[in-house]
């Protein structure tokens, strides 16, 4: 079983296609990570206003989760269309995305991990960090990194 990381981007879609071309008809788990909104922070008396209420935060989390489910369904459909026997896994990000990917790959005992690369410049990679770069450097199993389409 391989782990296909999917975020809904064109690069992730391309990665699924390339992975199937290279790896063939193997079982796959499509992984989509979602981030809940930041925890509710009470208003600061110095500012004097409250930006988000707990109810608004809950509603926002619900909208984000709904979108995450749609993205996952899309990824599973793309993987199955490409020829994989795919199932989906939606995971709330508690740690960094790269750590979540590696933890799930370990849990599933994935043969390999497939990620798309955004193609960050050297400066962007230092400032923003790169998920694919971190996965490659910390993985204990093969990682296929598919670059973004030019």
Segments from the language model and where they lie:
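Conserved beta-strand positions in the Rossmann-like core of class I SAM-dependent methyltransferases
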Residues: 29, 87, 144
């Amino acid at each position: 079983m391989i782990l296909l990381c999917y975020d809904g981007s064109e690069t992730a879609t391309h990665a699924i296609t390339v992975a199937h071309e290279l790896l063939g008809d193997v079982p796959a788990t499509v992984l989509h990570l979602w981030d809940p909104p930041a925890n509710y922070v009470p208003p600061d008396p110095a500012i004097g206003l409250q930006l988000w209420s707990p109810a608004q935060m809950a509603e926002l989390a619900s909208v984000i989760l709904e979108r995450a489910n749609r993205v996952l369904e899309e990824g599973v459909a793309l993987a199955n269309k490409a020829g994989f026997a795919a199932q989906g896994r939606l995971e709330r990000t508690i740690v960094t995305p790269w750590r979540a990917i590696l933890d799930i790959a370990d849990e599933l005992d994935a043969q390999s991990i497939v990620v798309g690369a955004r193609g960050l410049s050297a400066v962007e990679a230092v400032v923003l960090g790169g998920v694919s770069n971190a996965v490659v450097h910390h993985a204990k199993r093969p990682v296929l990194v598919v670059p973004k389409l030019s």
